[in-house]
Regions:
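Aromatic/acidic polysaccharide-binding cleft in carbohydrate-active enzymes
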Residues: 134-135, 163-166
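Polysaccharide-binding and catalytic clefts of secreted carbohydrate-active enzymes
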Residues: 1-148
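A short helix->loop->beta-strand "cap" motif at the edges of active sites that frequently abuts
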Residues: 105-106, 159-163
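Short amphipathic alpha-helices and their capping/turn segments at secondary-structure boundaries
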Residues: 119-122, 152-158
Length: 166
């Protein structure tokens, strides 16, 4: 531990700029996550309602991430993609926190961002020693004070009785 350092902060703005990656490695990881979640392609077809969407799969290798398409995607596939993306980001944060904890006794945090849709903060909060939030209120926006108050209430709930910081 270093003098003057009182806490570690893992990566910044997980899921921002951009939140999604559709590269071949992420596509393979998505299929592996689906295999873990559903066990086989028939359970995936049932969960996703693929008969209705004319997207029935015969092998998990046929499943691609819901990248740009001419129409809207299967909503169940999008939900699982969001869950997968959150899982990947959270796994990265947890790996960074684990490394920090191996070398330091200082608390670990990362910045949440109010109501940020790319991550499930309820799942993330238990992996952190201290919940923290970024806030960038626009002084010209009359609703900004309400948004900051709402985010503070959310952080207090996520902290579960533990301290949290802004």
């Amino acid at each position: 531990d270093l003098a003057g350092v009182f806490m570690w902060h893992t990566g910044n703005w997980y899921g921002g700029h951009p939140a999604d990656c559709f590269c071949p490695a992420c596509a393979r990881a998505f299929r592996a996550w689906l295999a873990e979640r559903y066990g086989d392609v028939e359970r995936l077809n049932a969960a996703w309602g693929t008969d209705f969407w004319s997207q029935r799969y015969t092998d998990l290798e046929q499943v691609a991430p819901p990248a740009a398409m001419p129409t809207f995607p299967n909503p169940a596939q999008m939900l699982d993609w969001r869950r997968f993306s959150d899982h990947q980001l959270r796994s990265l944060m947890e790996a960074e926190a684990r490394i920090l904890r191996e070398h330091s006794n200082l608390p670990v945090t990362t910045n949440f961002m109010g109501d940020f849709p790319a991550t499930d903060y309820w799942r993330w909060a238990d992996s952190l020693d201290i919940v923290s939030d970024d806030s960038y209120p626009d002084p010209a926006d009359p609703a900004a004070a309400h948004e900051v108050a709402w985010a503070g209430d959310l952080m207090r709930g996520l902290a579960g009785g533990r301290p949290w910081i802004l």
